[in-house]
């Protein structure tokens, strides 16, 4: 919400509600699919799962090659020189896009904010970690008008430093530099974001017009934002700055603010700090008729070379710029950090007005403060102005107490903004082990910290001895496999959270998640803890093993035994080095969003789940970062191992449960079986012998999709072949190790 945010057309005087025009911002015509475009498979069969989603960034698309190591290149970078060059760009105004007040700081803050601010907690998608703002749809969102210019201003810096700095890092770093150049002391900064080279399909909303809201609010009478969305409005980062659906109601806007910032993992104080801090700099742009603004970058003529929103109002730039349609300068010191945002907010009474572009905003009442706000290009002074969402900070009891306290204690605001800004920029990056550079501060609670290894690790002999103890403990193969999967399977590749490291399976809230079968964990974990304690008490040389490591090792031992029982000798790679986090270093509320509503790998779904199970399986595979073949072999192997939730027999197509066989695929593809939906159990299918009618198997959609979907059937056929039983075991073990090590960034 810093600097410009996209405006919607203001409510019409006779109704007080937002316009129902094609796009609420008249400057941004809403694009529509061409009616005569060739139909895709998705158009013809929209309910089929799209396995290609599991391969979003193919190696062939990367011009730097598979061997490129960003961390290695970054190590060659002079970060102080980079900072100096970014600040130089920021303070050197260009005629083709003149800088407000001679400083692009506000623009760069908005660019960084709008890159990082797409992050959402429910599925970990969004954020600035891959440089996605360069691509559609983000590069053409109404909320990102003119950020194409910000990135273009940075091109000389990117060109100079080349592969040593990614676009993803540079976009985020520029905003941090902007704050520092204007006198703000930041909390820290980490590099380490690697670029991708093509856009990723993310469901930002089901609306088919910019600034639509109808599909994300179910219309039940309650304003309840559907999951997993993080914004109230299609094409905006958070909320409509004019108020919900363009109705200028600061109290209603505050409710939306709280919801959307909460979905980005921000509490009330962090939310207020970000708004106050971000709006302490720069201005918004709504100099004239927004109908004179041209199409977004993706729809702009080829000769504009990737720049969009070309305006024919006056010069189209500088004093004539139109970005959001709002024309607000928040403070008398727009290029300097101080407390004048709050001094201005509370120093005047406010009345509703409209910008020159017709957008709702507030101005100081009765002409108070006229001339106290400087013009960005040396013109006459202006009156104080605020967005509807700024007034929310004063009028809403949610934020009033917080901001009034900061009015009297600006040092508390500075501290809160520094930490909230750091969190905003880094929330999607995962643990600090992924961070690069000299300015990384100590780990924060929201980063799910794990302690460092402070002891010698187990060696190969220790690993072998521990495997023997685990297998002799009385715990079964399914118990050991399910426990390891419960730990490692919590990982989300989107925001690098979850996983086995930290041993948080033994802590709240994960220990009580329904998917993890708490009653089973109560049987398994004490046995593993006793093995751990006995080893740590007797091992030579101070060697120790964490419970996090032992959980993974025990699952790997079970896989080896299951392979041996199927006739194959194979070693499952194990890399020690995980540590055990404490309950105090685990934010229970933050971890709650990781709880799976379904996990098709374990054939689990919460009772009453309405979404198609096969779609939820694909989503779980996406979050784990596994490919189509890996998802296929994992499901088949886990069924053979008996790793279903609750010991269910659905999909266990074998008379040798516990042995790592390819029986799942062989029997699924057997044409001697006829499948029908069960008449007695919801979401269950029954496989009957075609000749006798006898019941042979039961299954869910998580199982049958591998015979139904043409892409997955092709993969299943590979693993069902007589000559690929060994390949099945090898591929399962490789995929298993990948999942177990997903969060071991120290190994990568």
From Swiss-Prot:
Formation of the three residue Trp-Tyr-Met cross-link is important for the catalase, but not the peroxidase activity of the enzyme. The keyword Ion transport does not apply. Its cofactor is heme b. GO terms for biological process: cellular response to hydrogen peroxide; hydrogen peroxide catabolic process. Binds 1 heme b (iron(II)-protoporphyrin IX) group per dimer. Heme b binds at residue 279. InterPro entries: Catalase_peroxidase, Haem_peroxidase, Haem_peroxidase_sf, Peroxidases_AS, Peroxidases_heam-ligand_BS. There is a cross-link at residues 238-264 (Tryptophyl-tyrosyl-methioninium (Tyr-Met) (with W-113)). GO terms for molecular function: catalase activity; heme binding; metal ion binding. Belongs to the peroxidase family. Peroxidase/catalase subfamily. Bifunctional enzyme with both catalase and broad-spectrum peroxidase activity. NCBIfam families: cat_per_HPI, PRK15061.1. PANTHER family: CATALASE-PEROXIDASE, HYDROPEROXIDASE I, BIFUNCTIONAL CATALASE-PEROXIDASE. This is Catalase-peroxidase. The lineage of its organism: Bacteria, Bacillati, Actinomycetota, Actinomycetes, Mycobacteriales.
